[in-house]
Structure formats: structure tokens, C-alpha cells
Amino acid sequence: MEEEQDASIPALEPFRVEQAPPVIYYIPDFISKEEEEYLLRQVFNAPKPKWTQLSGRKLQNWGGLPHPRGMVPERLPPWLQRCVDKVSDLSLFGGLPANHVLVNQYLPGEGIMPRPPPQPITSLLLEPCSLLVLRGAAYTRHLHGIAAARVDELDPASPPPNAAACCSALPGARLVRGTRVSLTIRRVPRVLRAGLLLSK
């Protein structure tokens, strides 16, 4: 209970997803369609070497170079910094700004799941332009993933717990997937100066 209280963000409580592990917030229309289109243009205009092909997705890494001793920080591009500032303004990181972004692209039929895939305890519907916030046990104790599918079928008897916030979550709906682009915005607490990384 104490962990849940520490993870709660009072200003986001209207967006809390009930009947789900604590604490999950789902904010529909967090960005506008115009902002979405702008971000997508910038993502797909990124230099080809910026993309890394992984199993079931493609990835861009912005904000720093991962290293066992810490992250070597890099300045975020202005087009991405605006979105990062908007998330940081929610006070998700103890008043500190986010400093790292992973951009993931999933084609229809692609996904990423833990191996072996566990029995899911909940499943959410994430619509375009929305923001999903995982805190507390939902972030520290549970794995999360995206099922590799081309169509998502909503069970009328068991709708996703955030269905009330999703205009496409009609009972029995068949939702055909398009290309999915997601931004994982986070704060990496341990960063290094380049000189420290190179020192003995």
C-alpha cells in the first residue's frame, strides 16, 4: 500500500485504470493529431543509421548511449524535446526532467513479448495519441509486452479495463492494426560525462 501511495500522482488520479495492477494511468488524446503527424514525420525522416532492427520491431535511441557504468548523455533534438517536456511537466520523475527516449516501430503482425510468455493478468487498448504511465508495482513487478497480431478482437464479456476511455473499444470490435510507433520516455538516473567513461 505504501508503494502504491508513493507511486500515485494526484493530478493524474482521474486517469487511473482500475481493475489493473497499481499504478496505471491512461490519458487519451495526450497529444493532438497535428502533433502526432509532426512527430511521425520527424521519426521517419531520421537518418537510416539511427534505426536498429530488432526481433519484432525497429528502434531509435535518443538522449544517450547506454553503458554498464551509466549513460553518456546526448542532447535531444528539438522536435523530441517538446514532447519530453510535456511528459516531464506531469512530475513523473520526482520533479526531474526525462532524459531518454526509445522510439519503437511495429508493423502489423509484429510485437514484443517476454520468453516464455506468461499468463497475462490484464490487457489494455492503447489508441493513437494516448499516454500510458506505469508506476509502482505495475512497473517494478510485472512484465509488459505487445502481442504479435494483425487484428485485435475485443471480447464483449471481458473488455479492457480502460475501455471507457477508448472510443474504438466497442464490444466485439475487430481492430485491424496499422504501423504502430511508440515513444518510451523515461529518466535514466545514472549518467556519465564522456571523460569519465574513457578514464581508467
PLM regions with names:
Residues 1-200:
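Non-heme Fe(II) oxygenase metal-center motifs and adjacent flexible, charged/small-residue loops
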